[in-house]
Amino acid sequence: GTYLYGLCGEGSLILAGLVDHLCTQQKLKGAGFVVVVPSGNEQAALLQDKGFQWAFPLRCLPREVDRNLWSQAEFDTVTAKKLCELRARFWPDTVQLPPEQMAVVLGDLYSSGATLVSNDNGYGIYFRKEDTLYFVEMMATGDRAAEILMEAAREKEVIVEKAVITVGAAQNLFLGEGTRQDYGMIRFEGEPFDVSESYMRLMLD
């Protein structure tokens, strides 16, 4: 597949023509699908006219984080290779960039103060702002495993009491909770396939 980003043009007609050209070229190169994260509603509407459909929705949910000295996890910087391995382990049906491009995404995250928390049952990437942890990605074997990661992060950061977590809408964490958010779109250049339980996040957007 192919990922489009940084789409811009002087007027919708020029941008529409650019999208058509790019998709045609990628199909000739063997791409079975093209994905994109639209910059806004106007661009999303244009992309829908060009055969793209919404996919990869997210859920954003706030949670109180209990204090628990027994919750253990490791804190480290994660390499692009390691993140791809973690995603393959906890959610194989993930659309993601190759490690070389993921390294750029991770570099931006860590220069902005992101921290990785992980153990054998999951991992999360978060920022701290005042008394709240903002998890931009979290994958774990279940709700309790995710709570342990948050509790360990609370002990490290000391002053936090709350967390805001962004997960894939179909993820098995805290099902039924949170506000659904649109994220990515997909256009099939070959035979369509089911992406209702697929995940895409932390792209070059």
Question: Predicted segments — roles?
Answer:
Residues 1, 32-35:
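Beta-sheet entry/capping signal
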Residues 1-11, 130-142:
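Conserved acetyl-CoA binding element of GNAT-fold acetyltransferases
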Residues 3, 30, 134, 157-159:
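Short loop/turn motifs at secondary-structure junctions
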Residues 6-29, 36, 142-155:
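Conserved acetyl-CoA-binding loop-helix of GNAT-fold acetyltransferases
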Residues 28-31, 52:
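A structural motif
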Residues 34-37, 96, 116-119, 125, ...:
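A structural signal for short, well-ordered beta-strand segments and their strand-loop junctions
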Residues 37-73, 136-143, 147-205:
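Active-site/acyl-donor-binding loops of N-acyltransferases
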Residues 49-137:
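Amide-forming acyltransferase catalytic core, primarily the GNAT-like/NAT-type
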